Design a protein with these regions (language model features):
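Transmembrane beta-strands of outer-membrane beta-barrel pores
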Residues: 1-6, 43-49, 58-59, 90, ...
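Surface-exposed extracellular loop regions of Gram-negative outer-membrane beta-barrel proteins
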Residues: 1-13, 20-26, 145-156, 175-199
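Residues on the lipid-exposed face of transmembrane beta-strands in outer-membrane beta-barrel proteins
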Residues: 27-31, 82-88, 134-140, 154, ...
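Repeated loop/turn-to-beta-strand initiation elements of outer-membrane beta-barrel proteins
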Residues: 36-39, 90-96, 144-148, 186-192, ...
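Outer-membrane beta-barrel signature, preferentially recognizing the C-terminal barrel domain
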Residues: 47-102, 119-132, 141, 258-261
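Outer membrane beta-barrel strand-and-loop segments of large Gram-negative receptors
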Residues: 75, 94-151, 158-175
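C-terminal beta-signal and adjacent terminal beta-strands/loops
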Residues: 221-293
Length: 293
């Protein structure tokens, strides 16, 4: 990829030039051991660009003490990923991976130097990130009544800051999920979904435990023309993320509130389309005689 940009600011009377030539290869080798076992090695180089909101320099006030602003001088991030994967019988999959991200970008919170009461959420390229982890996925079926998908990820990450406002941190992070479908009868199906984010480091933040539990039940009539389902999401209201990090030596704590707990009832009725029905064909009493002519 070759990119050349030129930015002209009439207000500041400045010109900013930026150009680069980058190659982003993707290489993979797959070896079929037998019909049930497959192993593969992959490498990929990628680029990640900030969206417009992160580049927008204008301030967005959420209160008289807090505002957010983008950074038009942000650079893209470059990602290198190496992985070793193994798959068994299309039901068990595991991958060991190493990911290196240079100049990762995002928004971080600072105390306003002009007024210490104010908090500023400012975008920038703050960290170089190295992550070593393992991902596991297992699908199995128990008889005719249960289908289960189990996934898990464990990662050890290192965050190297390029600004004095943030210290270098490193640590573990892991998450697991369990997705179950229970076939109680030919027309009645139950659902159970569990997701747990174990306390650890995620995107530089030190997060507390977040647990999600969803339950559901679905009924389909004999002719499959009607489906009635009921679903309860975030049953215990424990999925809200809570995390913290240090900015300029001051601990920033965040307790996000998302109204994710709800009950959903759905009715789907298939009525049909009378316009797609074939029109009847009428024949006269002497149609057979006419066809002989």
């Amino acid at each position: 990829e070759y990119t050349y940009t030129k930015g002209l600011s009439y207000t500041l009377n400045t010109i900013n030039n930026n150009h680069y030539l980058r190659v982003f290869p993707a290489v993979g080798i797959e070896y079929l051991i037998n019909n049930s076992n497959t192993i593969s090695i992959d490498y990929s180089g990628r680029i990640k660009r900030p969206n417009f909101q992160l580049l927008d320099p204008f301030r967005w006030y959420t209160s008289k003490y807090d505002y957010s602003e983008g950074n038009p001088f942000m650079k893209p991030s470059y990602i290198h990923n190496v992985s070793l994967s193994y798959m068994y019988n299309n039901s068990f999959y595991t991958k060991m991976y190493f990911t290196k991200t240079n100049k990762d970008f995002g928004k971080m919170v600072f105390l306003d130097s002009e007024n210490i009461q104010n908090q500023v959420e400012r975008a920038g390229n703050y960290f170089d990130i190295s992550a070593l982890g393992i991902n596991i996925e297992y699908n199995f079926q128990l008889g005719y009544w249960l289908e289960t998908n189990l996934t898990g990820d464990i990662t050890y990450s290192s965050y190297i800051s390029n600004q004095t406002s943030f210290k270098n941190v490193r640590g573990w992070g892991s998450d697991f999920s369990l997705d179950n479908s229970f076939f109680l009868s030919k027309r009645l199906t139950g659902f159970l979904y569990i997701e747990d984010d174990i306390p650890g480091y995620y995107n530089y933040r030190k997060a507390k435990n977040a647990f999600l539990l969803n339950l559901g039940l679905s009924y389909t009539n004999k002719n499959k023309t009607m489906i009635v389902s009921i679903k309860a999401e975030d049953l215990f209201k424990t999925s809200n993320p809570k995390y913290s990090y240090y900015s300029n030596g001051i601990k920033q704590k965040f307790n996000n509130y998302y109204d994710s707990q709800h009950l959903e009832i759905t009715l789907i009725k298939k009525i049909g389309n009378i316009f797609n029905k074939a029109k009847p064909t009428f024949q006269s009493s002497n149609s057979e005689e006419r066809n002989r002519l």
